[in-house]
Regions:
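N-terminal positively charged helical leader segments and presequences
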Residues: 1-71, 122
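RNA substrate-binding interface of SAM-dependent RNA methyltransferases
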Residues: 72-145
């Protein structure tokens, strides 16, 4: 089942329908090629998961009807990850895998032998979002720089 991440999902629900707009709708239509009648999974990153059926689609939006919604409790104990920052590509891989494994908080640490480069917060959020969708993880990790 294809998944999509919508940050403010509770605000998007109107009479049992959700409108997926912009790049997310484009991705579902053109890249994932979801069809009318197909089910998708919508995640809000805070434990709310919604299974929805595609009702209609326009140029840059998708109307979906809610079939089922679940609120998942966070894992206890909370899993945190602190890592010394290696090269940039390796850091990206660490962030992706940590998200897929269900890590709640990620802390990059700078030491004498680690790479020192600033993390672009927007880029990190896109990496975490893609890993969240890939793994259907209902919780978006916090990245504390």
């Amino acid at each position: 089942m294809r998944a999509v991440y919508i940050k403010d999902l509770k605000n998007e629900i109107k009479k049992g329908l959700i409108t997926v707009k912009g790049d997310k709708a484009h991705h579902l239509q053109k890249v994932a090629r979801v069809k009318i009648g197909e089910n998708i999974l919508i995640l809000d990153g805070r434990g709310l998961t919604v299974t929805a059926k595609v009702e209609s689609h326009g140029k840059r939006e998708l109307q979906v009807k809610i079939i089922e919604s679940n609120v998942i409790e966070p894992n206890k104990p909370s899993l945190d990850l602190a890592f010394c920052s290696p090269k940039k590509n390796a850091s990206d891989e660490i962030l992706k895998i940590a998200t897929e494994l269900g890590i709640n908080k990620i802390y990059p640490i700078y030491s004498d032998y680690s790479s020192r480069y600033p993390f672009n917060q927007e880029r990190v959020e896109k990496l975490l979002e893609s890993a969240l969708i890939q793994s259907n993880n209902p919780f978006f990790p916090k990245f504390n720089e």
